[in-house]
């Protein structure tokens, strides 16, 4: 993410969150279970922690937490995933994407395997890159770098991101807590341009299936 504290105020700001198609389609980056490559998942190649390190060093509680929080798995599901990972790494270090896939893919029926694996990989990727922390920092900096009546548009690709953006635009904070000034007016820096998120239509999804989960939210900074 960018450090907006060093930038001049802007009139328009666009933000497309998440991993790019280029990164997903680059086997050596380790973002996708479609390829058998090293577990990496770092957006910043200079970062110290990668997916391989995470999976082989995080303890049981840490792993359960990331699958529960970032994959939206139920507690029992997070425990099962974690148990299989720990059993596998006790025998051999998890090094490649297929090492991970092979130890957990049988936990669910074949018909939902891809969705299941996508959520597992998403959980690990979010933790490796501290994506939600970066998004919160970005949102908190917006009122300082966007001019009055400036426009900001953000595209999210999963519910965790979208919840943070939705809350911030509606209330001015990522928790979604309404704060009022001395006169009882809601104190928030932005007004919604579109009350509901803009989502792709069937034609766009057919052309680009990865757009299926995308949501576009637009807000305008108050004077």
What do these predicted ranges mean?
Residues 75-86, 121:
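Short, well-structured alpha-helical segments
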Residues 50, 61-65, 81:
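Post-DEXD/H (motif II) to motif III coupling segment of the RecA-like Helicase ATP-binding lobe
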Residues 66-70, 88, 92, 107, ...:
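Alpha-helix C-capping/helix-to-loop hinge sites
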Residues 58, 62, 70-76, 91-93:
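Phosphate/pyrophosphate-binding catalytic cores of soluble transferases and nucleic-acid-acting enzymes
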Residues 96-144, 151-223:
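C-terminal catalytic and target-recognition region of SAM-dependent MTase-like enzymes
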Residues 1-8, 12:
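Single conserved hydrophobic/aromatic residue that forms the stacking wall/gate
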Residues 13-15, 19-60, 172-176:
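A mobile, often basic/glycine-rich helix-loop segment
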Residues 90, 146-147:
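Helix-to-beta-strand junctions that scaffold the AdoMet/dcAdoMet cofactor pocket
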